[in-house]
C-alpha cells in the first residue's frame, strides 16, 4: 500500500466519523426521522440550487420523483467545483461537499453573498442519511460523475465521463433515502409542490419543475415561474378575497449588499395577521427585526399621509397599527449575507440592522407610493378609520358591560 493510499484512507475515516454522527442522531440535523425529516433531505438539495439562483447563475431547477423511490434534483447553475480541495488534498471539492459537515460555498467562502438552507448543515447530511447518492456535474466543458453508498461511503470517485452536452453547466443529485433511518421513504407530491411554489414566488423568474414518475403515483407534473415575484405571491394569497383595489403595491431598497422588497394589497376582510416575512427565502414564522421595521414604519407613514391629506383631523387620535393592518396582505422578503436566526428552526430574524433598513425603505418608498396612488391611499385610510371606530366601539361596549355587571353584583 502506498503512502498516498494510506493518507487517503485515514482522511476518509475521519470524514465518515462526521457522517456517522448524523446517522446516530439524525433528529439533531433534520428535525425528525418522520415525514418532516424525509422532506428536509429534498429541501437541503434544492436550497443549494436556489443559492445558485440567488447568486444569479441558475434559472431552472427540476425535481423528479423517480420510479424506484429516489429523488433527483437538477439545476443549470455553475456546477459544484471539481478541483482538489485546499484543506483535504486527497479529495476534490465536490467530494468534500458531499462528505464533510458544513462544507460548501455558503460557509464562510466567497461562493455566495446570500444563502438559505433551513439548518445550513449542507448536502453531506443527505448523503449520510441515504443508502445511495449519485452526483453528476457539468462544469468547464466536461461532465463528471461520482456516487456514494451506505450513508456516505465513497463508492466511485469523481471522474470525468465525457463532454458536457451542448456546453451545459449545472449539478444533478439523485438520492435514495435510507429505509433503516426513516419511518417511511415515500415523498409527498403536495408537500413538495407547495414549497416549490413558494420558492418560485420568492425568486422572481426562477423556473421550478416537479414531476412524479412513480408507478404508484398520479404522474403529476407542475411548473412554477413568476416574473412578478412577491407581487404575484400577494395576488395569489388574495385571490380568494375581495381586494380593496386592483393593483399590488411594491417597494424595494438595497443598502451595502442587503436587500428588502415588500409587496402589499389590502382586501375587504377584517384579519390583521396577513403579514408574511422571509429572510433569504426562509419563512420567518415568528417574525423578527424585518417585520418590526415594517410595522412601525407602516403605522407612521399612513398616519402622516392621512393628516397631510386631511383624511383624519390633526387633533384626532392616531390610527393604531392594528387598524391599518386590518385586511392587509403583505410579503416582506429580505436578503442578507449573515442572517442571525433565533432558534435552530430559523423562525425569527435577529439582525438589528435589518430593522433599520426595512424601516427606512418603508418610510421613504411607501410614502412615495401613497402620493402616487391617491385613490388607493384614500381607500386604505378609510378602511383603517372604520377599523378604528369598530375597535373603540367594542372597547366601550366591554367597559359598559363590566360596569353593569359590577352594579348588578
Residue ranges and their predicted role:
Residues 24-43:
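Conserved short strand/loop->alpha-helix "switch" segment adjacent to the catalytic nucleotide/phosphoryl-transfer site
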Residues 79:
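NAD(P)H-binding Rossmann-fold N-terminus in SDR/SDR-like oxidoreductases
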Residues 27, 34, 54, 82-85, ...:
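Short, flexible helix-adjacent loops and helix caps
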Residues 82-104:
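Short conserved segment of the HATPase_c
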Residues 1-11, 19, 43, 51-53, ...:
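GHKL-family ATPase ATP-binding module
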Residues 11, 34, 86-90, 226:
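Residue-level signature of the cytosolic catalytic core of signaling kinases
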